[in-house]
């Protein structure tokens, strides 16, 4: 979607002086992306389902591209829709319309997650913003890193550093406010009355803690990105 914002993740990338190339696949397609030209691949959220190939014909190519990067040992990050596409890429099932979560949600780091660099600095429990109705089964080759009470498969890793995160760790409180205020009809469909009766209280209660956890995850992901030896 055009109003996707990388928030805390963008700040971490900029702090690491990353050179970022943007592709608006939903609007312009993917073109020819050469694996050797990039050190990492990040796929944020969006409105389609991960299997909506008829309306969004770029999705199969995106799934193949994510797997190509992951199989090459490069860092991959799929957020929300991106996580669902990564799960698809590694042979998992996409479960549509059965996993409604919205607003800041408690998450639990699994035993495998506590060993993973993305979650090593976090408390076993943390909060992060959610906005989805779909989920996925876990790829056979994946390690489950985080879960919630309602939706078990919240974060997984395949291989060295191909990560799928259902939750929006990158969305700071300010980003959430921009998203929800500019998509009021969509908010009302998933959480009727939330904007009027609960948004301010949820933000005041959870946003600061979620921002702190999200910033740690963002920095840790950036640290997984490996540059070619001749560029180090």
Where are these regions (language model features)?
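N-terminal beta1-alpha1 cap of cysteine-dependent amidohydrolase-like domains
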Residues: 1-72, 193-232
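Conserved beta-strand termini and adjacent loop/short-helix elements that scaffold enzyme active sites
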Residues: 23-25, 97, 131, 147
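Glycine-rich, phosphate-binding/catalytic loops in enzymes
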Residues: 12-15, 57-61, 94-95, 146-147, ...
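Cysteine-nucleophile active-site neighborhood
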Residues: 44-113
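Short glycine-/acidic-enriched loop or helix-start segments at secondary-structure transitions
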Residues: 6-8, 32, 52-54, 87-89, ...
